[in-house]
Amino acid sequence: KNKRLTKGGKKGAKKKVVDPFSKKDWYDVKAPAMFNIRNIGKTLVTRTQGTKIASDGLKGRVFEVSLADLQNDEVAFRKFKLITEDVQGKNCLTNFHGMDLTRDKMCSMVKKWQTMIEAHVDVKTTDGYLLRLFCVGFTKKRNNQIRKTSYAQHQQVRQIRKKMMEIMTREVQTNDLKEVVNKLIPDSIGKDIEKACQSIYPLHDVFVRKVKMLKKPKFELGKLMELHGEGSSSGKATGDETGAKVERADGYEPPVQESV
């Protein structure tokens, strides 16, 4: 019995305090080329050790970034989720993974004396991504209206919801993911819905409030490189060491931004 006790004691005394951060590396996170600001931030990962490879620990990480940080503008109530799909050198290349409205924006729109209309739809893009889009809109007073409330009849609500679903389906079905994200950035879909429903009942605050990624096609590096504005170099890069190629393309960031 005593033997075991002393053995345990010895083990406790020997333990050295190792700073866990000494085993970790910082990686840069890069957003796709559709956004103005490509450098989102940094992320930590434990260095490659034995069978545990660092890049595997990074793949699948989701970063939630405000649109204001991606586009350098003031409107900050849209949040985009970006997922790491590939690691090249010290860069994590991300792809669109979803969109959301901030809680405070959502709560500020919901008020009394108006009807809230919500719709959702599952659509597949032309390049095989299955998205679920949620839309929200609110009725508003007509210009000459005196009555305090502006409630839509159930029939009108159903018509508006049908229109919402039609427009969302149409806008996504005919485009690939890149185009869809380009539409989500200024939320042109919401504006289209607002215009289309004007004849049924005047709406305001119409937004695609959320986009979920349900299914993705098989991962292709070439497609991801195209998203990151390096489509031309990706063909050549496959033969040589990819790390150096990407580093170079990365050094040329300002001109890339101007073209966007």
Swiss-Prot record:
Cellular localisation: Cytoplasm; Nucleus; Nucleus, Nucleolus
PTM annotation (ADP-ribosyltyrosine): residues: 151
Domain of life: Eukaryota
Keywords assigned by UniProt, alphabetized: Acetylation, ADP-ribosylation, Cytoplasm, Differentiation, Isopeptide bond, Nucleus, Phosphoprotein, Ribonucleoprotein, Ribosomal protein, Ubl conjugation
Phosphotyrosine modifications at: 252
Post-translational modification comment from the UniProt entry: ADP-ribosylated at Tyr-151 by PARP1 in presence of HPF1.
Location (main, coarse): cytoplasm
Cross-link (Glycyl lysine isopeptide (Lys-Gly) (interchain with G-Cter in SUMO2)), chain numbering: 30, 245
Region Disordered, residue ranges: 228-260
Database matches in Pfam families: Ribosomal_S3Ae (PF01015)
Post-translational modification N6-acetyllysine, affected residues: 30, 52, 245
Amino acid composition bias (Basic and acidic residues), ranges on this chain: 238-251
Residues modified to Phosphoserine: 232-233, 259
A biological process term (GO) from this entry: translation
One GO CC term on file: cytosol
PROSITE patterns in the record: RIBOSOMAL_S3AE (PS01191)
Subunit structure, as described in the record: Component of the small ribosomal subunit. Mature ribosomes consist of a small (40S) and a large (60S) subunit. The 40S subunit contains about 33 different proteins and 1 molecule of RNA (18S). The 60S subunit contains about 49 different proteins and 3 molecules of RNA (28S, 5.8S and 5S). Identified in a IGF2BP1-dependent mRNP granule complex containing untranslated mRNAs. Binds with high affinity to IPO4. Interacts with DDIT3. Part of the small subunit (SSU) processome, composed of more than 70 proteins and the RNA chaperone small nucleolar RNA (snoRNA) U3.
Functional summary from the UniProt entry: Component of the small ribosomal subunit. The ribosome is a large ribonucleoprotein complex responsible for the synthesis of proteins in the cell. Part of the small subunit (SSU) processome, first precursor of the small eukaryotic ribosomal subunit. During the assembly of the SSU processome in the nucleolus, many ribosome biogenesis factors, an RNA chaperone and ribosomal proteins associate with the nascent pre-rRNA and work in concert to generate RNA folding, modifications, rearrangements and cleavage as well as targeted degradation of pre-ribosomal RNA by the RNA exosome.
Protein name per its UniProtKB record: Small ribosomal subunit protein eS1
Biological source species: Felis catus
